[in-house]
From Swiss-Prot:
Disulfide bonds: none annotated. Residues 1-307 are annotated as: Formyltransferase ArnAFT. Pathway: Nucleotide-sugar biosynthesis; UDP-4-deoxy-4-formamido-beta-L-arabinose biosynthesis; UDP-4-deoxy-4-formamido-beta-L-arabinose from UDP-alpha-D-glucuronate: step 1/3; Nucleotide-sugar biosynthesis; UDP-4-deoxy-4-formamido-beta-L-arabinose biosynthesis; UDP-4-deoxy-4-formamido-beta-L-arabinose from UDP-alpha-D-glucuronate: step 3/3; Bacterial outer membrane biogenesis; lipopolysaccharide biosynthesis. NAD(+) binds at D350, D371, I372. Its EC number is 2.1.2.13, 1.1.1.305. It catalyses: UDP-alpha-D-glucuronate + NAD(+) = UDP-beta-L-threo-pentopyranos-4-ulose + CO2 + NADH; UDP-4-amino-4-deoxy-beta-L-arabinose + (6R)-10-formyltetrahydrofolate = UDP-4-deoxy-4-formamido-beta-L-arabinose + (6S)-5,6,7,8-tetrahydrofolate + H(+). The gene is arnA. (6R)-10-formyltetrahydrofolate binds at R116, V138, K139, R140, A141, D142. The lineage of its organism: Bacteria, Pseudomonadati, Pseudomonadota, Gammaproteobacteria, Pseudomonadales. This is Bifunctional polymyxin resistance protein ArnA. Pfam families: Epimerase (PF01370), Formyl_trans_C (PF02911), Formyl_trans_N (PF00551). GO terms for molecular function: carboxy-lyase activity; UDP-4-amino-4-deoxy-L-arabinose formyltransferase activity; UDP-glucuronate dehydrogenase activity. UDP-alpha-D-glucuronate binds at residues 396, 401, 435-436, 463, 494, 528-537, 615.
Amino acid sequence: MSNKAVVFAYHDIGCAGIEALLNAGYEIAAVFTHADDPKENTFYGSVAQLCARKGIAVHAPEDANHPLWIERIAKLNPDYLFSFYYRNLLSEPLLATASKGAFNLHGSLLPRYRGRAPANWVLVKGETETGVTLHRMVKRADAGAIIAQERVAIERSDTALSLHHKLRDAAASLLRDTLPALAQGKITETAQDESKASYFGRRTAADGKIDWQRPAEELFNLVRAVTQPYPGAFCAVGEHKLIVWSAEVAKGNEGQAPGRVISVDPLRIACGQDSLVITSGQRNANGLFLGGPQLANELGLVDGSLLRGAESGRKPRRTRVLILGVNGFIGNHLSERLLRDDKYDVYGLDIGSDAIERLRSHPNFHFVEGDISIHSEWIEYHIKKCDVVLPLVAIATPIEYTRNPLRVFELDFEENLKLVRYCVKYNKRVIFPSTSEVYGMCQDKNFDEDTSNLIVGPINKQRWIYSVSKQLLDRVIWAYGAKGLNFTLFRPFNWMGPRLDRLDSARIGSSRAITQLILNLVEGTPIRLFDGGEQKRCFTDIADGIEALARIVDNENDCCNGQIINIGNPDNEASIRQLGEELLRQFEAHPLRGNFPPFAGFRDVESKAFYGAGYQDVEHRKPSIDNAKRLLNWEPTVEMSETIGNTLDFFLREAMLEIADRAKQEAR
């Protein structure tokens, strides 16, 4: 029986995995690892050195998912792929090269603590048990069926390093017991319970910052989660950095404010609850490792000193969010949602303000009326000033793609590229609105952010200029990401709701489909169905969409960094004809129905008669929302009929205001 394996491995758990495969009689055709980062403290075993000793071919490509590497791996005819602490996700085409399956060893008891740095996170969260899991690899990270698990107790004395050693030993034990059965096909697979899943992103040195307002128990867990060989928990003391390597919890805080030094021997600091005794640490990155009392002396601390940033009751600075296009459909709803949290200052610019009038009196909302193509100095200053930038300005109505293609390109690509470059210049996080249009005529059943092809029509079909402008900017942002830009791309799928457009926009043909259909009902003109109205879309309620976007802005645990996220409702798929029929049903039942003319019927129209010869439509557009579920813990909840009802009601009330205005003018 052939048991040929290709292995993706790093860390000394990667070494343990390779040793276990060899001991179980597997043939290792090749190993893929990472080159060590000279800026990283490599306290763990070297996979490359182990392979050199064992005479195993080893590679460290920048991208193992590149088609050339996939082709080379396929030629090895592996029965299995194994991933042991390899840091990159393996693509579906790569996973498919293994005839008997691909398997990953993860450092937690899945489905809990999916994602990065699970050994650190379980300590941060104060868990008393973790473990290792061998599971089948699928497209979604850490989501495949479980093959085997081994539990590991977490002692109060454990640090990230000691826990890592326990996990390494547990991994060796689990693989020793499981790999022979896997080779014989005698394994049982258990699907993961998604209701119990949790996901955590990567950790950085900045995550070790100590907030003395927190309970001492939380800070104790933080200290042991990031102590040596990691960068350590830290806070500022005057002009110095205090790095805490070990600590203990002491009951009570003597009624002192958080951050106040209760005593220097032992070095005891008051916390939001109880107090923390610092038993060892150092002053600054190049300082000596010292015990608590000597450390206090080095830092000039005395009883009653208050550590910087620890003033009692001091609230953290609100995150500054810059929304360009704040008066638009997404911009005004997102502003309202962020302001509800009271942890954001929202700065906005747009050429109008009708949709945000309800927000202008809010003390945390700051608006300037202006054009992004003119107010470049104001924009650059506010990008430099703010923490998060959302460039929402775009022409996003289909008729403009064929009527004004160059204007679409100038605004949607050229002007937005300037904004992205400012974000690069000032190292600011950008959340960029891509679009479901980038998928074009993709034939996948569900459009996937990471694997679906982006397919558009010929050059003479001008309608694709919007799609390719957005796609090109997506690619530019992705390339800047490789150079350090912090970004998230989100792709809305047919969001609908109040304030989507204006009826006046529909009168000149420059609106979304539902607004045009409502205008037909309001004015008693036939509802035009282009090319039969059989094109299907997945309609998403604005409340659902904004909730997902707000979670991207929150970016808990940095989970959205460098990600592309579809935001849509695959369960709300309907044709444009079905949309029109549901609109009509609700229109006829609406209390304001009597104020409008009789229904004039449906009329089939060729799309080119309205959009022009450069138009080309798409038959279906359904998102995969796996990334949104995994990263944001989000799913849409609003049914399409409710969304249609809310949208219809908004526009009918707008129409009633128009009727009242006309009556006033006629009475003069």
